[in-house]
Amino acid sequence: MAAASEDLAEPEPYPAREVLAAFATACSGIEEIPVAQASVQAAGWEHYSPAADSAIARIVASGEELMAKEDPTVQILDGGIWRKSVAGRELFTVISGVELEGVVSHGCRVYDLSAPAALPLEELRDWAVRDPAERPNGIPGGSKFVWNPGLKPGHMEMEISFVPQGTVLPEPLAGIPLSGIVFTASSVEFTDL
């Protein structure tokens, strides 16, 4: 009888505040990759070298391949992959960037690849203390919220997206094992000005 009552138990609520705080701490220094790396390390994230066939490694490799196809002159700036358990959630932070003619862009992404649902808009609004723009992500059941400026002044954009578990992504993303919640902070510097 105990097993049956355990099966009926409500799932634990998603630890949104803790995960959002981890994202803010990890990604607040994204203007400079070394600063972002120091921030994640100081916050207790572990530098991580995933197996090549792991979901996070495939996501990163696919992103780099897509950028190189879009512009063969792009220089990929690698800031590393980091891992941390936050309130029982396994999170990955990916710090990266690209350098193109006249533009340097840095990005910090925190992935919760097993998140079962999107964060409620009200919770995101309360946390960010401002309204996001809601943008379609073209994925049934998915969501995408964007803030401009981003996580803090000086950041270009902040985005929080959700992809339902088991989703097959459309081209050109087909084959990328992306699911769950992705928290993104980005900065852009125009070097030709």
Predicted features along the sequence, with ranges:
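Short glycine-rich, low-complexity/disordered patches
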Residues: 28-56, 134-151
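Hydrophobic transmembrane alpha-helix bundles
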Residues: 36, 69-78, 174-187
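Long, charged/polar, surface-exposed segments that mediate recognition or autoinhibition
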Residues: 73-151
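Accessory recognition modules or surfaces
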Residues: 4-20, 37, 51-93
